[in-house]
């Protein structure tokens, strides 16, 4: 099955989900229909693993807008396969989990699963795209679907604000990324990613190389919640927990990391890129791990935990980016080791963090709270979730015998080896190691503290008063499966390493086969070395801080109020006030003012073109034959048009406007175009009658005083537009080098079966244009229908 067929199959499933919204009895099955999408995708990608290991990559290219080099280019190599497996396999767990989490009585299930499947489709599009513009389209689709999912409970103010904040930040990054893609096209002349990476040596010497890197970093940092763009992720926790488990821990937040990994052969040629990504990642890791201890909400803790872990992966991506400069050097193995560690931890993080979010969701769903000040002694009520969250949290902390320990050891090992790399000095290495170790200590602290406070403190029935708590097996099943994978990967890491991570490394290197001998062998025991010593320090200090310190009392008062998000909110409010004032000044609910603005902008554009290229000399002027009737009709039209400027009665103005239309009908008759005349007569009659009838529905607004300044502006704009139209007619007649297309229509109209040339143009030559004009009318009608029925739907929702 082709990659295109897979994406089409997902779209078909989305259509089936949409059909279930028509009947409430069918809506409860929407989740199981949606579940087929990740199942089909998982089976497909698992079947491709043997081929990708043998370096037999799938690629598809379908022409789209070939003149702009925008095609549907898809490619499945090792890197895209690894991310596709994460998206689809984690998707199975999340989709099934959502069927148990959401209620068919309270929630609009078809809408939720449609958005969730759209997000999965968009993420697969990002990782499979081999065309920059196609990648951008899917990139923004993830922002749109994320917005829809975060605002799913739209009656909740936090959901609305969180959705808008995440949308604004990620779309800003997406637009910056688009600018970067355009710069790449200017430098290379292609939008194909494989071809772009093949020109890396040429691009690095271009003047746009550094600006392009900055645009890429803005796109990656906003999407992957790097400091200071991290603020949208905690707010996004207002979404349903399945959304948090899927988008905001395992998939969407990894899109920025994927972008940098995909373009590592190009971006890694700049030392500036390596420094920025490394230190921004470490700052994010440190900031996230400390801020997580300020949170009382379990999802808030996991949100900042995700920010911290993403920073950790980002730092390794930055350090490993130097491989692009040193592929043939002796130190190339260090860069490969760091990139391997980044990919390994990316996979591990998706597993244990998704399990943690699911555990928190079950606690919230069954216990009715996520507040660690209320939850205590939950191991008695939730024994399965106690096991799941304890193992997943300890894996995140880097405790032995769990998969997180292996990737955390590799991370510490990578930091200690930075001193051997040309990009980093000894002082830089010391700073990097200190930042990584301190962040890891706080990571261990909040992981252990979270589990201790929720499960291992004394149960207090006075604080937690909810009764009849139960822990359904089907609800717990996805998190239990993910929990089992945590120790399994620890004991057999190289099965995943050779089958998934090594092919992904080839993708990161741009298909360089020389990377294979440099790939590290993952072992559980490395002997007594510096990373092990650092791990012992992290565990000891982290345990003391988690057990001996009551972090609920540490971050209180003014310390707790310090927040980067509040700075964003202040800027947002000021920006909103500023734009509201300007908006009210421009948007005054006067249609003629909007028309003046639109025409004014058009005139400025045309005028600028005239200034730049100048007006051509009029050396020929073709004027159609005309008689006395045409002259009389033209004079009548001008007189009526001028009179409209001075008349103030609405009814008279409408009638005179209709008269102009009837005069145009006479023009068509004089020019021997009866079909056009009949069409014009019918349309003009209907619109004039409707216009007059609509007066009965319009409010009796007092007549406004004549504003001479406004009238002068109207007349000036009208005269200028008339001059521009006439000048464009003259310019069109001077085009000697181009043959008129009119002759083609005259020769080919017989083939259409039409009775006249106008019908042939509308029905055949520009049929697609006519079709889309009809589509615009349909969309407008649907919008009006939605507005008219808004109150009815709102009342029905309130009754339900």
From Swiss-Prot:
Provide the assembly information. May form a heterooligomeric complex that consists of seven subunits: mnhA2, mnhB2, mnhC2, mnhD2, mnhE2, mnhF2 and mnhG2.
Q: This protein's superkingdom?
A: Bacteria
| Bilayer topology term | Multi-pass membrane protein
The record lists the membrane-crossing segments as 1-21, 33-53, 78-98, 118-138, 167-187, 207-227, 241-261, 273-293, 300-320, 331-351, 387-407, 424-444, 472-492, 527-547, 595-615, 627-647, 651-671, 676-696, 712-732, 768-788
* Secretion signal span: none
Gene that encodes it: mnhA2
Q: What protein family is recorded?
A: Belongs to the CPA3 antiporters (TC 2.A.63) subunit A family.
Which keywords does UniProt give here?
Antiport, Cell membrane, Ion transport, Membrane, Transmembrane, Transmembrane helix, Transport
In Gene Ontology terms, what is a biological process of this protein? monoatomic ion transport
For this UniProt entry, the molecular function terms from Gene Ontology, in alphabetical order, are: antiporter activity
Q: Where would you find this protein in the cell?
A: Cell membrane
| Protein name as annotated | Putative antiporter subunit mnhA2
> What GO terms fall under cellular component here?
plasma membrane
């Amino acid at each position: 099955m082709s990659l295109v067929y897979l994406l089409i199959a997902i779209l078909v499933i989305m259509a089936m989900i949409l059909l279930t919204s028509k009947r409430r009895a069918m809506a409860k099955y929407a989740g199981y229909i949606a579940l087929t999408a990740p199942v089909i995708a998982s089976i497909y990608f698992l079947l491709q693993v043997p081929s990708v290991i043998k370096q037999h990559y799938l690629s598809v290219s379908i022409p789209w807008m070939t003149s702009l080099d925008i095609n549907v280019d898809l490619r499945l190599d090792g890197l895209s396969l690894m991310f596709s497996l994460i998206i689809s396999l984690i998707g199975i767990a999340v989709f099934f989990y959502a069927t148990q989490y959401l209620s068919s009585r309270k929630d609009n299930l078809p809408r939720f699963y449609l958005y969730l499947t759209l997000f999965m489709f968009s993420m697969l599009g990002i990782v499979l795209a081999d065309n920059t513009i196609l990648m951008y389209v899917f990139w923004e689709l993830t922002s749109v679907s994320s917005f829809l999912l975060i605002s799913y409970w739209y009656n909740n103010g936090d959901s609305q604000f969180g959705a808008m904040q995440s949308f604004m930040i990620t779309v800003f990054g997406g637009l910056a990324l688009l600018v970067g893609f355009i710069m790449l096209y200017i430098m290379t002349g292609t939008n194909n990613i494989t071809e772009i990476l093949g020109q890396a040596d040429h691009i690095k010497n271009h003047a746009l190389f550094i600006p392009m890197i900055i645009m890429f970093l803005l796109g990656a940092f906003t999407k992957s919640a790097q400091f200071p763009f991290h603020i949208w992720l905690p707010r996004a926790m207002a979404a349903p927990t399945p959304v948090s488990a899927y988008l905001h821990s395992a998939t969407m937040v990894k899109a920025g990391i994927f972008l940098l990994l995909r373009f590592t052969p190009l971006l890694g040629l700049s030392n500036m890129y390596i420094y920025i990504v490394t230190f921004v990642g470490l700052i994010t890791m440190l900031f996230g791990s400390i801020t997580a201890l300020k949170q009382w909400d379990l999802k808030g803790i996991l949100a900042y935990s995700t920010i911290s872990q993403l920073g950790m992966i980002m730092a390794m991506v930055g350090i490993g980016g130097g491989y692009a400069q040193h592929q043939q050097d002796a130190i190339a193995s260090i860069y490969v080791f760091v990139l391997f560690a980044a990919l390994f931890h990316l996979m591990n993080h998706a597993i244990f963090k998704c399990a943690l979010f699911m555990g928190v969701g079950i606690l919230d769903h069954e216990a009715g709270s996520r507040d660690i000040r209320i939850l205590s002694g939950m191991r008695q009520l939730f024994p399965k979730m106690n096991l799941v969250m304890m193992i997943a949290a300890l894996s995140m902390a880097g405790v032995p015998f769990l998969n997180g320990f292996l990737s955390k050891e590799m991370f510490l090992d990578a930091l200690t080896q930075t001193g051997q790399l040309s990009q980093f000095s000894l002082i830089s290495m010391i700073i990097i190691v200190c930042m990584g170790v301190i962040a890891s200590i706080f990571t261990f602290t909040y992981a252990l503290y979270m589990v201790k406070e929720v499960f291992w403190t004394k149960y207090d029935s006075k604080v937690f008063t909810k009764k009849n708590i139960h822990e359904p097996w089907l609800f717990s099943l996805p998190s239990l499966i993910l929990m089992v994978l945590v120790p399994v990967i620890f004991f057999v890491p190289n099965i995943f390493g050779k089958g998934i991570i090594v092919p992904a490394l080839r993708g990161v290197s741009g298909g360089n086969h020389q990377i294979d001998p440099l790939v590290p062998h993952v072992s559980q025991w490395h002997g007594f070395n510096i990373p092990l010593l650092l791990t012992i320090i992290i565990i000891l200090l982290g345990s003391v801080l988690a057990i001996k310190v009551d972090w609920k009392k540490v971050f209180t008062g003014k310390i707790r109020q310090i927040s980067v998000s509040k700075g964003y909110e202040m800027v947002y409010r000021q920006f909103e006030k500023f734009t509201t004032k300007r908006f009210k000044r421009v948007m005054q609910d006067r249609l003629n003012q909007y028309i003046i603005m639109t025409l004014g902008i058009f005139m400025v554009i045309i005028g600028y073109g005239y200034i730049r290229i100048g007006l051509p000399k009029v050396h020929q002027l073709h004027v159609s034959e005309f008689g006395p009737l045409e002259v009389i009709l033209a004079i009548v039209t001008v007189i009526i048009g001028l009179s409209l400027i001075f008349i103030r009665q609405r009814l008279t103005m409408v009638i005179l406007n209709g008269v102009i239309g009837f005069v145009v009908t006479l023009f068509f008759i004089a020019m021997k175009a009866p079909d056009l005349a009949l069409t014009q007569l019918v349309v003009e009659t209907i619109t004039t009658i409707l216009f007059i009838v609509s007066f009965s529905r319009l409010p009796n607004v007092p007549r406004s005083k004549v504003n001479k300044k406004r009238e002068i502006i109207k007349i000036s704009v009208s005269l200028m537009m008339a001059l521009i139209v006439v000048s464009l007619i003259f310019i069109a007649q001077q085009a000697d080098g181009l043959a008129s297309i009119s002759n083609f229509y005259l020769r080919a109209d017989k083939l259409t079966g039409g009775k006249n040339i106008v019908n042939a143009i509308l029905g055949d030559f520009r049929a697609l244009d006519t079709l889309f004009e009809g589509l615009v009318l349909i969309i407008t009608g649907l919008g009006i229908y939605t507005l008219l029925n808004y109150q009815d739907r709102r009342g029905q929702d309130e009754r339900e």
